[in-house]
């Protein structure tokens, strides 16, 4: 009898082992859908980005006009632009839910997969930041100026590093050109790292809601989870289409409809909504270098989570104290996001400082203590 080609062909075999015959735990919930949704978001962003790049001009004299030209004169340019802009928001919603799932169910104990995931997150944030500069509106220009200028806080090399990134003594045409280059290049680096992420994941196998080893109860990925993922795709595409067609500017800043003007500073300089929690942490520290370090550490702290895991149980499913802390962390992050969008005045300054301290306390102090306490309670 002839062997099935999907199991013998060198290339198709890889796809088969990753998407068809992959042994998958039988009890993984909808929270495991976000990995595939992120893959869909990445494909949508790359495709819409390629079509936008065909019509975009990376020069300060014509960048703003070229975006207007895309929306007004290019066939379905408005749809491509709206899908790309709102696709970034959907991407970050899925990323944050994916990370939250990993924290809740202890997926971070698969260390290689988790660490690659954190690197992907950093690259994703870099891609989104440089992409936000490209329309060359007021918030694009001032956001680029403020955030890149933070690097000048680094001792010895700071000023040189900022001028090197700017390509001059201010954010100018050279800056825009290199930011466009990075925005074009980085998604493909993310694709490569996603492959590595999946490689490490399939090396160890997926986690499941109980956090227990599920080798004795696995089912093939197709048809069970492939159809489940398709349902997720339709739901995501519905929300993305709704955003792009009905409220395309819901999540954008009105300031960005004004062409960049170095002589006029916007009343409130703030990034897109998905960076506001980190921006709030940055602003809550009066010292410039301290703020930059806190900003970096707000993301890099995820690398410490596997090291600080003290519980005998992997998942939070049977750990009520840690569950409470987890949801308090979620609430705290939402508060930080709200504070990041508010002006720098009381009471927002104090709330931001308290929320920043508690954000780091959850990871460094409260979760390890809760894990240790729950271990003690198991022995009662």
Swiss-Prot record:
GO terms for molecular function: metal ion binding; ubiquinol-cytochrome-c reductase activity. The lineage of its organism: Eukaryota, Metazoa, Chordata, Craniata, Vertebrata. It is found in: Mitochondrion inner membrane. Keywords: Electron transport, Heme, Iron, Membrane, Metal-binding, Mitochondrion, Mitochondrion inner membrane, Respiratory chain, Transmembrane, Transmembrane helix, Transport, Ubiquinone. Belongs to the cytochrome b family. Heme b b562 binds at residues 84, 183. A ubiquinone binds at residue 202. Its cofactor is heme b. InterPro entries: Cyt_b/b6_C, Cyt_b/b6_C_sf, Cyt_b/b6_N, Cytb/b6-like_sf, Cytochrome_b, Cytochrome_b_C_euk/bac, Cytochrome_b_N_euk/bac, Di-haem_cyt_TM. GO terms for biological process: mitochondrial electron transport, ubiquinol to cytochrome c. Component of the ubiquinol-cytochrome c reductase complex (complex III or cytochrome b-c1 complex) that is part of the mitochondrial respiratory chain. The b-c1 complex mediates electron transfer from ubiquinol to cytochrome c. Contributes to the generation of a proton gradient across the mitochondrial membrane that is then used for ATP synthesis. The cytochrome bc1 complex contains 3 respiratory subunits (MT-CYB, CYC1 and UQCRFS1), 2 core proteins (UQCRC1 and UQCRC2) and probably 6 low-molecular weight proteins. CDD domains: cytochrome_b_C, Cytochrome_b_N. Binds 2 heme b groups non-covalently. It is a multi-pass membrane protein. Heme b b566 binds at residues 98, 197. This is Cytochrome b. GO terms for cellular component: mitochondrial inner membrane; respiratory chain complex III. PROSITE patterns: CYTB_CTER (PS51003), CYTB_NTER (PS51002). SUPFAM superfamilies: a domain/subunit of cytochrome bc1 complex (Ubiquinol-cytochrome c reductase), Transmembrane di-heme cytochromes. Heme 1 (or BL or b562) is low-potential and absorbs at about 562 nm, and heme 2 (or BH or b566) is high-potential and absorbs at about 566 nm. The gene is mt-cyb. It comes from the Eukaryota. The chain crosses the membrane at residues 34-54, 78-99, 114-134, 179-199, 227-247, 289-309, 321-341, 348-368. Pfam families: Cytochrom_B_C (PF00032), Cytochrome_B (PF00033).
């Amino acid at each position: 009898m002839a062997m099935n080609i999907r199991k013998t062909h060198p290339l198709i075999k890889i796809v088969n082992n990753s998407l068809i015959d992959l042994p998958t735990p039988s009890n993984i919930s909808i929270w495991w859908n976000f990995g595939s949704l992120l893959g869909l978001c990445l494909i949508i962003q790359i495709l819409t980005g390629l079509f936008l790049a065909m019509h975009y001009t990376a020069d300060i004299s014509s960048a703003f006009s070229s975006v207007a030209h895309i929306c007004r004169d290019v066939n379905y340019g408005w749809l491509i632009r709206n899908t790309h802009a709102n696709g970034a928001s959907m991407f970050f919603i899925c990323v944050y839910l994916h990370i939250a799932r990993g924290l809740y169910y202890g997926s971070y104990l698969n260390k290689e997969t988790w660490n690659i995931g954190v690197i992907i997150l950093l690259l994703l944030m870099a891609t989104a930041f440089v992409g936000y500069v490209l329309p060359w509106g007021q918030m694009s220009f001032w956001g680029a100026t403020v955030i890149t200028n933070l690097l000048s806080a680094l001792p010895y090399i700071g000023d040189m590093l900022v001028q090197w990134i700017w390509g001059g003594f201010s954010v100018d045409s050279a800056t825009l050109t290199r930011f466009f280059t990075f925005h074009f290049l980085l998604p493909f680096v993310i694709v490569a790292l996603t492959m590595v992420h999946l490689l490490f994941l399939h090396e160890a196998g997926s986690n499941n809601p109980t956090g227990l080893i599920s080798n004795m109860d696995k089912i093939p990925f197709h048809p069970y989870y492939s159809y489940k993922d398709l349902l997720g795709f339709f739901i995501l595409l519905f929300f993305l289409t709704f955003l792009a067609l009905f409220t395309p500017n819901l999540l954008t800043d009105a300031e960005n409809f004004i062409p960049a003007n170095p002589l006029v500073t916007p009343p409130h300089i703030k990034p897109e909504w998905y960076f506001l929690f980190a921006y709030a942490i940055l602003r809550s520290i009066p010292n410039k270098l301290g703020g930059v370090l806190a900003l970096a550490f707000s993301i890099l702290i995820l690398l410490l989570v596997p090291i600080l895991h003290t519980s005998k149980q992997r998942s939070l499913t049977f750990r009520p104290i840690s569950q409470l802390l987890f949801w308090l962390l979620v609430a705290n992050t939402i508060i930080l996001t709200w504070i990041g969008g508010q002006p720098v005045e009381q009471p927002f300054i104090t709330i931001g400082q308290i929320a920043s301290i508690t954000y780091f306390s959850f990871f460094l102090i409260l979760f390890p203590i809760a894990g240790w306490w729950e271990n003690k309670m198991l022995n009662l």
